[in-house]
Each structure stands twice: as structure tokens, then as C-alpha cells.
A protein has these predicted regions:
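Short tight loops/turns at secondary-structure junctions
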Residues: 1-28, 40
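Short, positively biased Gly/Pro-containing turn/loop motifs at secondary-structure boundaries
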Residues: 37-66
């Protein structure tokens, strides 16, 4: 990705800290959107057996022009 910008990805995380769903909510060109969604799907969070079965949130990725 050669351009810069911001991409917001909505994620769903299970109790094991795994991202079970990710989709781009806004921003970026096709390259940035693909890279941000891939990075979100590969993210891991803390395991919490007492957490809700599913939690949702967003991750904002900021791309710097290269």
C-alpha cells in the first residue's frame, strides 16, 4: 500500500481472545482495507473465561504513506 490513511475494522472476540469476525467499517483504499482486515483477524487478546461469550469493538489502523 503506497497511500496513507485510516481504516476502522470492527471485530468480534471470543473468551479465548481469538478474533472470530472482522470487517472494515470505514476508510482506506482496497489495499489498506485488505491489510487492516487481515491484521485484525490475526490479532490475539487476553483469555478471560468470565468474559461474555462474544465481545465486539473496533481497531483503528493508521497507514503512513511510503
Amino acid at each position: 500500500c503506497e497511500s496513507g490513511g485510516e481504516v476502522v475494522v470492527e471485530i468480534t472476540v471470543n473468551r479465548a481472545g481469538e478474533v472470530t469476525a472482522a470487517r472494515v467499517r470505514s476508510g482506506g483504499d482496497a489495499c489498506m482495507r485488505e491489510m487492516a482486515e487481515r491484521a485484525a483477524r490475526n490479532s490475539l487478546f487476553n483469555i478471560d473465561d468470565s468474559a461474555p461469550a462474544r465481545q465486539t469493538g473496533t481497531i483503528t489502523y493508521i497507514f503512513i504513506p511510503q
